């Protein structure tokens, strides 16, 4: 569900590269459709709020409503700081994902893994959420931004009212962070565990060797 995680798994966990682009397209499309569904269900409330507070859709004041669909930064942090926040929190998330899915580290598996990941996301949201909205997922941010742009917010949905288009931060920050997090895990932790990275490839190679030996 996260293009940043998909790309990191492709680079460091032998995820099939043929699935990367279809996965990312599906993830963005899913987020776009989810935003459209929310807008359709709450349409009357959007209109009523705008009329009550005299908000013109597409203005800077309308960003509060656009924030229902995607993330926008705290007005007191700059572009570079926002990028750093998204990069760091996604690196932490990616490191935990690899730790929980690594066969060699002996951590609890099964139904406990999603719970631990969910708890980490909750902690990140509570601690770093006020800074950038903790996107950590290019699909869940860019897909809804595209919908908001089409639904009347226009350019402001992508720029966030800033000189440098803000959509670049939650689009590329998590990708860079996930890659760095996966690299750090493989470099400093995974390499010391009694487990190879590409288990699937090893199994395929072993099966092929056995098949050739039987011929």
Walk through the language-model features, giving the residues of each.
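Membrane-interface helix-loop junctions and terminal tails of multi-pass membrane proteins
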Residues: 1-215
């Amino acid at each position: 569900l996260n293009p940043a995680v998909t790309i990191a798994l492709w680079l460091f966990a032998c995820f099939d590269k043929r699935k990367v682009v279809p996965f990312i397209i599906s993830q963005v499309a899913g987020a776009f459709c989810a935003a459209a569904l929310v807008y359709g269900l709450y349409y009357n409330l959007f209109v009523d709020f705008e009329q009550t507070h005299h908000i013109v859709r597409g203005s800077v004041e309308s960003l509060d409503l656009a924030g229902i669909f995607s993330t926008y930064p705290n007005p007191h942090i700059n572009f570079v700081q926002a990028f750093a926040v998204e990069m760091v929190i996604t690196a932490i998330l990616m490191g935990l994902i690899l730790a929980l899915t690594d066969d060699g580290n002996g951590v609890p598996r099964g139904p406990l893994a999603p719970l631990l990941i969910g708890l980490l996301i909750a902690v990140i949201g509570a601690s770093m959420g006020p800074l950038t909205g903790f996107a950590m997922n290019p699909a869940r941010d860019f897909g809804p931004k595209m919908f908001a742009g089409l639904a009347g917010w226009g350019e402001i949905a992508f720029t966030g009212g800033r000189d440098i288009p803000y959509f670049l931060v939650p689009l590329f920050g998590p990708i860079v962070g996930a890659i760095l997090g996966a690299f750090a895990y493989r470099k400093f932790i995974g390499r010391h565990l009694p487990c190879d990275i590409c288990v699937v490839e090893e199994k395929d190679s072993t099966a092929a060797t056995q098949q050739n030996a039987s011929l």
